[in-house]
Amino acid sequence: MKQYDAIIIGFGKGGKLLTAELAERNWKVAIVERSPQMYGGTCVNVGCIPTKALIHESEYAEKRYYDDYKNQSKLYALAVARKDKLVSFLREKNYENVKNKPNITLYDGTASFLSENTIRIVSGKDETILEGKE
C-alpha cells in the first residue's frame, strides 16, 4: 500500500490546483483521474472550451458563407479538427504541469473508497491501493 499525505480524486480545475498547492507545501500528493482524456477536467475537454471553440468556428462559417450551407458544411470537419487540436494542447499542458513536480504522483483509473483514508484505483486489470492522511 502506497502512503500519501493527501489523495485528490479528479484532475479538473479544483483537483489540479489543490494538488499543486499541497505539493508546494511539501505534502506527498496522489491525484487520480479516470481517463487521460480528461486531464484538466470537464471544462477543458468536453465543456466550456470545446463548446466556445465550435461556436466561434460556426460564427466564422456563417459570416463567410452566409446562405451557402454547402460551403458552411465543408468547414465543419475543419472546425472539429481545430477544436480537437486545442483540447489536446490544453490537456497536454495540464499533464505537463503535474508530471514533473516533486511530491505529486498521477494515477489513471477509477477510484473508490475502501475506508475513510484508503482508496482503491482500478485501471483495466490493475489495482492499486493508496492510503492518505487527509
Model regions: which residues?
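The conserved SAM/SAH-binding core of class I Rossmann-like methyltransferase domains
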Residues: 9, 32-33
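Glycine-rich flavin
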Residues: 2-4, 21-27, 33-134
